[in-house]
A protein has these predicted regions:
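Glycine-/small-residue-enriched capping loops at alpha/beta junctions
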Residues: 1-74
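Phosphate/ribose-phosphate-bearing ligand recognition and processing surfaces
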Residues: 48-143
């Protein structure tokens, strides 16, 4: 995901990222979107899955909560999330979907500028997991 974003945004994004001095697991930073249609890019450092013994759930939840807080700080009305950490970091997809949706729903009251959250799912299975979790919260889901 990171490589695709950087390729599409252009070299200016990497140049700005180098000024951010890294980011801890579970935290996020924000940059301009440059050549992307998005005005901003929120960079999240999701946890590597180690069997759930290293506070991975808390770190993943922190990525979503902190991203929504940054949206509020910057007056952003919408945000799109991939399924953070479910690729090469091997976070279980069902657990990640539950954390993504529940954290987003719980964080929305402190982020009233946000009107739309999009979960960008790159497989039918991931989309089904996110839709199931949204249904648990009574949230609308558009395919």
């Amino acid at each position: 995901m990171d490589g695709a974003i950087h390729r599409a945004a252009g070299p200016e994004l990497l140049a700005e990222c180098r000024t951010l001095h890294g980011c801890e697991t579970g935290d996020v930073k924000i940059t301009r979107g440059y050549r992307l249609p998005a005005h901003r890019v929120i960079h999240a450092v999701g946890p590597v899955w180690h069997g759930g013994q290293r506070r991975e759930d808390e770190a993943l939840a922190s990525c979503y909560a902190r991203a929504l807080e940054l949206c509020e700080t910057h007056g952003l009305a919408s945000v799109a999330f991939p399924a953070i950490s479910t690729g090469i970091y091997r976070f279980p997809a069902d657990r990640a979907a539950r954390i993504a949706v529940s954290t987003s729903v719980k964080t929305l009251p402190v982020a009233p500028t946000i009107r739309r959250i999009i979960f960008c799912c790159f497989s039918d299975d991931s989309a089904a997991l996110h839709a199931r979790e949204m249904a648990e919260f009574g949230s609308p889901c558009a395919e």
